[in-house]
């Protein structure tokens, strides 16, 4: 089925074209215009042509005498045309500066001068094709909705056809605006026109509105801004106005009316204009200074407060705290080891936090202790555990206190032996356990006490005439190899022995000293050589391996820390 349109009455009716032009003008100025168009768009000529559109029925949903609803396929290739007039900006630099913020664009003197040129555009050769939903009712008029974009092509003729760039630009911009017009604005325009033709009430309302517009005077104040003046009014020069000056002003007076602005708003606008240098409203203004966008007073105060001399630096505070906590942890670890000798413990050291506390002399630092704890159960008396606890606490107290350089040397130090002692595995293996292995561990794990040679050199030069206690090699020999385990000692090893250390083995100054530094170094070397030879003779003795190799015993079991 096809429709036959009676197109001639639409062409002959002049009032219809006038009304359609007004509606198209309002629709074109409603949407946001591109910045190149600086004037209003006016429809000066509209002609629908002599060729009607073609409609193909796809679906009919409702059919009656006063109403109709259906879906159609529309195609139009006719001779309709439309003529528009407006004003455009011919200077592209002016258009660029208008669309950019002032603080991010240059400010030329004459190159940015606006140049407005009138423009006339004629749209013709429309080609439309799309699906239309058409609803007709005598009470509600015609409702037409496009399901897709119907515009295929059109021809744009303008004043700038001789300039290819401007012609192509206008072609693209107008096509984009017309696509929006067909989808959004054209259905509303057609609906209003249909109401004017078929609805008598709407027609009477339109006539009444036109009469009211004609009778309404066009001159006179529409809204008097002087009825409610601002709180702190100023004129265009910034001078504060009194209430009497405001009362004397009126819109009908012949005198020039001053522009009334609020002083607070002017200050805010001035601050906002000056703040374009730093993007902050509270940056102080300093001449001949390059501002940075992120330099604000709040950030400067916060950054300076961290490094102020009132509060100590963060790293030093952590170091002091870490040193205190490390001492407490070590003390608790020592007491825990003395109370629970059947479980392995670890000493946690605050390495990252105690860096500041380790900047002093090495004499203040406590030597790290390595202990091998027996995991096997053995009978322990309360007296033994008490003695171990007392020995550990005294050791920690004496080693944690910082000795002075002028203090006297200590002759006896009650200290828990640092040497790893392997307890007996069983009564049977106690008699067959080789003594050479334990003796070697004892001799290798013990070292000579350190000596402060630099302090002795200064002391020898300062006091060459005072007698010096000769270095006793027996002390060193006893220190290195005097502790020799026996089967009786392995069965009940002493937990807190008292060792006699010579005064020469400590790094403290002596009251009397004789001899030279060369003799002292020679004695130290001689003592070390004697101790090394004694250790080698004990290791290489033939009777030491007889017990181990003669009975064909199995291999030595792993240390108690790893074997179960």
Curated annotation (Swiss-Prot):
Belongs to the MDM34 family. This is Mitochondrial distribution and morphology protein 34-1. GO terms for molecular function: lipid binding. It is found in: Mitochondrion outer membrane. The keyword Mitochondrion applies. Residues 297-322, 329-352, 396-408 have a biased composition (Polar residues). Residues 297-408, 414-433, 452-473 are annotated as: Disordered. Component of the ERMES/MDM complex, which serves as a molecular tether to connect the endoplasmic reticulum (ER) and mitochondria. Components of this complex are involved in the control of mitochondrial shape and protein biogenesis, and function in nonvesicular lipid trafficking between the ER and mitochondria. Mdm34 is required for the interaction of the ER-resident membrane protein mmm1 and the outer mitochondrial membrane-resident beta-barrel protein mdm10. GO terms for biological process: mitochondrial genome maintenance; mitochondrion-endoplasmic reticulum membrane tethering; phospholipid transport. It is a multi-pass membrane protein. Residues 383-394 have a biased composition (Low complexity). Component of the ER-mitochondria encounter structure (ERMES) or MDM complex, composed of mmm1, mdm10, mdm12 and mdm34. Residues 359-371 have a biased composition (Basic residues). Keywords: Lipid transport, Lipid-binding, Membrane, Mitochondrion, Mitochondrion outer membrane, Transmembrane, Transmembrane beta strand, Transport. One of its GO terms (cellular component) is ERMES complex. PROSITE patterns: SMP. Residues 452-466 have a biased composition (Basic and acidic residues). The gene is mdm34-1. Lacks alpha-helical transmembrane segments, suggesting that it resides in the membrane via beta-sheet conformations similar to those predicted for other outer membrane proteins and porin. The lineage of its organism: Eukaryota, Fungi, Dikarya, Ascomycota, Pezizomycotina. The keyword Plastid does not apply. InterPro entries: Mdm34, SMP_LBD. Residues 1-195 form the SMP-LTD domain.
């Amino acid at each position: 089925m096809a429709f036959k349109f009676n197109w001639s009455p639409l062409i002959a009716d002049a009032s219809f074209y006038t009304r359609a032009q007004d509606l198209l003008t309002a629709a074109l100025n409603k949407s946001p215009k591109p910045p190149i168009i600086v004037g209003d768009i006016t429809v000066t000529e509209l002609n629908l042509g002599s060729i009607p559109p073609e409609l193909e029925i796809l679906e009919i949903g409702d059919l009656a005498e006063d109403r109709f609803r259906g879906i159609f396929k529309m195609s139009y290739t006719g001779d309709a045309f439309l003529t528009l007039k407006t004003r455009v900006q011919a200077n592209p630099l002016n258009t660029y500066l208008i669309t950019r913020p002032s603080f991010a664009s240059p400010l030329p003197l004459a190159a940015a001068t606006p140049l407005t040129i009138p423009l006339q555009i004629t749209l013709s050769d429309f080609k439309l094709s799309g699906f239309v939903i058409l609803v007709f009712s005598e009470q509600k008029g015609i409702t037409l909705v496009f399901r897709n974009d119907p515009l295929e092509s059109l021809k744009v003729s303008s004043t700038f056809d001789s300039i290819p760039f401007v012609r192509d630009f206008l072609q693209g911009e107008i096509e984009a605006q017309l696509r929006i017009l067909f989808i959004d604005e054209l259905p509303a325009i057609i609906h209003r026109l249909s109401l004017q033709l078929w609805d008598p009430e709407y027609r009477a309302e339109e006539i009444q509105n036109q009469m009211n517009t004609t009778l309404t005077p066009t001159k006179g104040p529409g809204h008097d801004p002087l009825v409610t003046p601002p709180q702190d009014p100023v004129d265009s020069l910034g001078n504060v106005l009194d209430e009497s000056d405001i009362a004397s002003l009126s819109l009908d007076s012949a005198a020039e009316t001053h522009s009334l602005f609020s002083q607070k708003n002017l200050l805010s606008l001035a601050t906002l204009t000056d703040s374009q240098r730093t993007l902050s409203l509270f940056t102080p203004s300093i001449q001949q200074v390059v501002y940075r966008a992120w330099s604000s007073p709040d950030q400067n105060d916060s950054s300076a407060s961290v490094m102020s001399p009132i509060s100590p630096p963060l790293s030093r505070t952590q170091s002091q705290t870490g040193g205190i906590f490390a001492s407490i942890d070590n003390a608790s670890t020592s007491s825990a080891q003395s109370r629970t000798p059947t479980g392995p413990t670890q000493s946690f050291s605050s390495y990252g936090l105690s860096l500041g506390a380790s900047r002093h002399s090495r004499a203040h630092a406590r030597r790290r202790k390595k202990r091998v704890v027996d995991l096997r159960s053995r009978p322990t008396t309360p007296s033994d555990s008490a003695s171990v606890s007392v020995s550990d606490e005294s050791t920690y107290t004496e080693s944690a206190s910082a000795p002075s350089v002028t203090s006297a040397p200590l002759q006896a130090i009650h200290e828990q032996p640092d040497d790893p002692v392997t307890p007996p595995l069983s009564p049977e293996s106690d008699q067959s356990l080789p003594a050479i292995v334990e003796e070697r561990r004892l001799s290798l794990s013990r070292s000579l006490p350190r000596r402060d040679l630099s302090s002795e050199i200064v002391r020898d030069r300062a006091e060459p005439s005072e007698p010096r206690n000769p270095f006793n090699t027996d002390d060193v020999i006893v220190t290195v190899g005097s502790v020799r385990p026996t089967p009786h000692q392995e069965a009940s090893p002493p937990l807190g022995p008292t060792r006699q250390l010579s005064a020469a083995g400590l790094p403290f100054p002596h009251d009397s000293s004789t001899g030279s530094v060369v003799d002292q170094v020679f004695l130290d070397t001689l003592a070390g050589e004697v101790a090394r030879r004694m250790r080698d003779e004990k290791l290489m003795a033939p009777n030491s391996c007889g017990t181990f190799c003669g009975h064909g015993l199995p291999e030595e079991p792993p240390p108690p820390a790893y074997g179960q």
